[in-house]
Amino acid sequence: DVYKRQNMEWYFVVWYLAATGARVSELIRIKIEHVQLGYFDLYSKGGKLRRLFIPKILREETLKWLCETQRTSGYLFLNRYGDRITTRGISQQLKNYADKYGLDSKVVYPHSFRHRYAKNFLEKYNDIALLADLMGHESIETTRIYLRRTASEQQALVDKIVTW
C-alpha cells in the first residue's frame, strides 16, 4: 500500500503549494502540529514574521488522511525513507508527474503554484496589499511581478474588452 500512500502524499503536496502560496522551502518545514493549528508561523526572506494559513477544507482533508495513515506528529511531507522531503525531491517528482501526464515540465515546478495562488487570490478577492502580506512580500511591487499576464492571456482580455 506504499504506492497509494505516496500518491496521496503528492496529491497533498500539490494542494498545499496551490492553496497556501508557500515557497517550496517553507512547505517542507510544515509539521502535522501546524496542520492541527491551522497555520504555520515562519520568518520570511526579509526576516519578517509571516503566518502561512492552511485553508479549512485543506486542513480537514489533511487531518483525515493523517488519521488513515496513523500519523500524529513530525514533518507533514516525507520521502519514501520516512525522512523529511527535500526541495529538490519535490521539484524532481513534479517533473516526473508532468512527464507522466503529458504536461509541459517547464511550467510545472514548485514556484509556478505560488504564481497561480497569487492570480487566483486576486481574481476572487481583489486586495493586492493583503496578498502581499500573505505572500511575505515587503513591497506590493514584488507581488505585482507574480500577476503579469502571458501574451495569450493579454490577447484574450483585449479580445473580450475591446469590442468597438
Where do the language-model regions lie?
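Active-site/catalytic core of tyrosine-dependent DNA strand-transfer enzymes
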Residues: 55-105
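Phosphate-coordinating loops and pocket residues in cytosolic domains that bind phosphorylated ligands
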Residues: 29, 37, 145-148, 163
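Short, leucine-enriched amphipathic alpha-helices that occur as contiguous helical runs
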Residues: 10-11, 87, 91, 114-115
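Basic, Lys/Arg- and aromatic-enriched nucleic-acid-binding interface segment
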Residues: 4-24, 69
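C-terminal catalytic core of tyrosine-transesterase DNA break-rejoin enzymes
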Residues: 15, 19, 114-138, 145
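Catalytic-site neighborhood detector that most strongly recognizes the C-terminal catalytic loop/helix
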Residues: 46, 135, 140-160
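Short coil/turn motifs that cap or connect alpha-helices
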Residues: 23, 104, 138-141
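Conserved tyrosine-mediated DNA breakage-rejoining catalytic core shared by Y-recombinases
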Residues: 20, 25, 29-64
